[in-house]
Amino acid sequence: SSTSRGLGDVYKRQALLHDVGKTKELSSFPLNDYTDEGQLLGHIIIGAQMIHDLAKEIPDFPEMLENQLVHCILAHHGELEYGSPKKPALAEAVALNLADNTDARMETLTEIFAADKGKKEWLGYNRLFESNLRRTGDV
């Protein structure tokens, strides 16, 4: 059915849309600073509002699909203490949180390795990863 097909597409849509609020949270180049809206609301709330507003402009947009997309945006940081107003309650939201967290951790790891480029393979203990980190290959 079109409903089940629409729900299956939530994975793709939320992967593309989860940080859409950053387009209004941050000012454009060269400033790259937080806007007033960004400071007051943050990209999660801004993004949820954007999706809600866009869904209302599309005739017969399924309310359940809108709610699922908005939920994925609201829950993509995973925990209340990390800025999510909601914890993931859908499989799609859990998957998005795991992917977003993995992406952020890998970016952090890349930055750690780049900063310690002159060091040998073992970089020592890292509090964020709670582990002794070792460089492998060209990373």
Regions found by a protein language model. Name each.
Residues 1-11:
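Single conserved hydrophobic/aromatic residue that forms the stacking wall/gate
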Residues 9-25:
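Conserved active-site beta-strand-loop modules that form the wall/rim of enzyme catalytic pockets
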Residues 12, 25-36, 56-117:
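Histidine/acidic-rich helix-loop-helix segments that form or flank divalent-metal centers
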Residues 14-19, 41-80, 128-137:
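Histidine- and acidic-residue-rich, metal-dependent catalytic cores
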Residues 97, 115, 119-127, 136-139:
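N-terminal intrinsically disordered, cationic/polar leader segments
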